[in-house]
Amino acid sequence: MSSQVSSPVRVRFAPSPTGYLHVGGARTALFNWLYARHVGGTLVLRIEDTDLERSTPEMVEGILVGMRWLGLNWDEGPYYQTQRMDLYKAAAEKLVASGHAYYCFCSKEGLEQRRKAATAAGRAPQYDESCRKIGREDAAARKQGGAPCAVRFAVPETGNTKFQDAVFGEVEFANPELEDFVLLRSDGVPTYHLSVVVDDVDMKISHILRGADHISNTPKQVLLYQAMGATLPIFAHVPLILGPDKTRLSKRHGATSVISYSDEGIVPEAFRNFLALLGWTAPEGSPEKLGDEELIKLFSLEGISHSNAVFDRPKLDWFNTEYIRAYPAEKLLPLIQKEWQKVGLTPANPDAQHLVATIELLKPRARNLKDFAGSFKAFFTDDYANDPEAVEKFLKDPAVREMLVELGERYANAGEFTEQSTEQVLRDLAAEKGVKAGGLINGARVALTGQAVAPSLFAVMVNLGREKTVSRLRRAKEIQ
């Protein structure tokens, strides 16, 4: 049985819609997408929705929304396993007919009792193969007579099952350690092992990139490939993603749903770059910041690590600030407008040219897209809140407030209103009052933006314009 698959390369992302697209699933999707694009292959999207109790249309839509936000376009699908049930049933019956599987009439209660007895006796709680001993004709007659039954795979009782993994090398399991696993439940619903292999064979999947937690499933699937007379795909099991405490990434480490990162103002390119480096290493000398073209060009199975990756949130935030700073303001504007819609913000000056200029001024200080609807709100609307700590620190002295009001009057009567002229007016006022210009600058910044930190004060004034600058400075006494 060959494990070398010739072109064309076909990979798949096959999530189960029992939850939203999470970080681990997104990384798997990204690796498949990158590999398909790197080799000019095909990415198939398959929704493994056979868990009828837990799979919901909302979760399916959540996965699709997450994929689209990430920018991971697929070439085929989505295919839904619930629409392919006849294929799985036919495959199970074919395996029974070829002697690779058999009908199991054991009840759930009986199986549970035997497992408990085995555990109590110190034995592995594996299936005892009692139905494997039933003759084919007898089993067929019982099934024909209406006896409820599942279908189990007949695992070879001796020998080993091995496969070559592109990441971990040769992996081998002793067959006696693999119990006769269920292929088709008594209600006709296929198990993961059967449906995934039938689909991968039918869809001509050449490479399977998935989490390392699937390694233990692989020998059973290899046996199924062999029993079906199908060529083995190339397996590449990618390392798990851990939290900072080196335990499996979970909700207690923060957000795990991909869309929650969108809600937090992360831009897709930053998230893709960050995810790509969780378990994959770029060639030596490559920069950390890698756009899509570079990632596609550099990605290879050889670069996938054996070691588990650690989710470093500060690193994600660093990538995000880097990408926001590098974005043209015109590209940021529609993303920021979505943030404004979320909070009901309507820009006081909707002129696109002015908005772009304002974004250009602010983006070097932006940590995420939410900043443009939060701490930068004063640049777009008069309906903003003042930071209490900033007010307490820089506007506590009534004398400063008095000087800011006077500063506003001087700006109202000034000839020019440029960065240079506004700075000169402020410094002249500070000199006349015998105070340091820095204190006046800090107070004016709070009066104009509500924040202690902002871009250059005089650039802020020019961006806001004379009228708004004067109006806000005149209200300095009223700020709370």
Swiss-Prot record:
Pfam families: Anticodon_2 (PF19269), tRNA-synt_1c (PF00749). SUPFAM superfamilies: An anticodon-binding domain of class I aminoacyl-tRNA synthetases, Nucleotidylyl transferase. Its main location: cytoplasm. The keyword Nuclease does not apply. It catalyses: tRNA(Glu) + L-glutamate + ATP = L-glutamyl-tRNA(Glu) + AMP + diphosphate. One of its GO terms (cellular component) is cytosol. CDD domains: GluRS_core. It is found in: Cytoplasm. This is Glutamate--tRNA ligase 2. The lineage of its organism: Bacteria, Pseudomonadati, Acidobacteriota, Terriglobia, Terriglobales. The gene is gltX2.
